[in-house]
Amino acid sequence: MGADLPPKFQYAFRRCLFYTFVLVAWLFIGMILFPALCTPAVKQDDNEAGIFRLDAKRSDLLNVLWAETITNGEDDWSELADQKLELYEKALLQHYGIDLDKSDKSFASGLQKSFAISTTIGPLDVDDFTTLGKLIAVLYALIGTPLFLTVIGQLGKMVTSVWQGTTLWIVTIVYIFISAVIYDIVEGGSDDVPFIEAIFSIFLQFTTVGEVDNEFHGVLPYCIVVLGLALITALYQEMQHNIERFIHPFEYSFNRLCGNVERWAGEKSEDKKSIVTSRIEEENEDEISDYE
């Protein structure tokens, strides 16, 4: 560790490194455990948007095949027909929730589930878990989530020991932009998809909101999300302090108002108590006079 780095950074780095090893071991346990405790159900996507997409693909298939029948020979037509039919078959399987490659991605699916449970970045499909799997997931989260928050906390201390204020804002924005570029490349984004969708997707991951259709491919996206969470957490803490300082005068006025209301209510309560006490004393005097 360089001598020019702040001691706070060096101490946080050593703690972060240790807890990262522990977290990786915990995620590895989940990667092995969850595939055995999950039974993905085949679900039919019966919404109108899914049906509309299937109809559009079928119409496109028929139109292209009809046009190519007139202009191309038999060999070219067969090759094109195979390509179009393969695309339509994939869309049809996806519509009915059938994933032919699911068995090959069992460990990747287990890693994604363990990462989502530990980082609180969802969503997860509860139907994918067996009854025992749901119980194990609860116990797994009780250990994994605090462990992950510890890693994020140490990363946040490293970040704030180097960058603060405007510099932290600039670093976070630049990192989100670079992460969106990497995400777009890894996910194979097309030119027809606006780049703002990649930025929005990255922002959802960094703020632990997540998105329904997100699936990480490889280890790189996980590393990007962890560092992004640390940056966003440090930024949120700084914004929290700024907001508290900004609204402190209003909070002080509100506390004074509450104090005045409490004193007023206390005085009313004391008045009622004194009235009740005086009435009781008068009744006691009347009873004593009756006996005399």
Curated annotation (Swiss-Prot):
Its main location: membrane. GO terms for cellular component: plasma membrane. Signal peptide: none annotated. The chain crosses the membrane at residues 17-37, 135-155, 166-186, 216-236. The keyword Membrane applies. It is found in: Membrane. Gene3D superfamilies: 1.10.287.70. It is a multi-pass membrane protein. Keywords: Membrane, Transmembrane, Transmembrane helix. SUPFAM superfamilies: Voltage-gated potassium channels. Residues 267-292 are annotated as: Disordered. GO terms for molecular function: outward rectifier potassium channel activity; potassium ion leak channel activity. Residues 282-292 have a biased composition (Acidic residues). InterPro entries: 2pore_dom_K_chnl (IPR003280). One of its GO terms (biological process) is potassium ion transmembrane transport. PANTHER family: POTASSIUM CHANNEL, SUBFAMILY K (PTHR11003), PROTEIN CBG08159 (PTHR11003:SF150). This is Uncharacterized protein B0310.1. It comes from Caenorhabditis elegans. The lineage of its organism: Eukaryota, Metazoa, Ecdysozoa, Nematoda, Chromadorea.
